[in-house]
Amino acid sequence: GDICHKHNLKFIVDAAQTAGSFPINMEQMHIDVLAFTGHKSLLGPQGIGGFLVSDEVAHEMIPLVTGGTGSVSDSEFQPEFMPDKFESGTQNIPGIYGLHAALCYLEETGIENIHAHEMELCKAFIEKIDALQNEKIRLVGVRDMNKRGPVVSFDFIGEDNAEVSFKLDSEYGISTRCGMHCAPNAHKTLETYPQGTVRFAFGFKNTMEDVDYAVQAIQKILQK
């Protein structure tokens, strides 16, 4: 944030993978815009998301979508006040209520507690995979737990990553996300393009037994 502001740039954070599992303070981190989805670590339903903006950005930004808001209906122009300025059309009320219930649970549980548990599982998972000493397994990302989140991506050398992901699901009941994760240029930089990676994401309800089961499943698949 500091670097962006020194160059008169806005600092925009995509918190799709971190909101709900990582403590975020927009003011301390100098974040101008924070975009999030509700269905991942925020534990809400699909089809709901949002963005938090600073007062400055809220004033300067021009809405991409305009239309009826249910307020200032006698005007042909978009309202300038928040949140109506960016909320045209009928809102996803069931999604909003679902996300609200999820946020209440997260607040009661504590983001710090969730983050600590998920990172403990992440650390154990990486260590146990490393212990296999299998040259086919390439961790994509850093091992420093202070510089990563509880999402782990692997590139299985010499294997079809999509096939590995399919077998994890069909044979072991383990859901992963395979592919380029809406970031093809990132995968080009990481040299995982065009196959992408197999991504594991740990949640608060996962256990150490789940970690052991996933490691064993990977080991068995690569032995076949």
Regions of interest found by a model, annotated:
Residues 1-224:
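Pyridoxal 5′-phosphate
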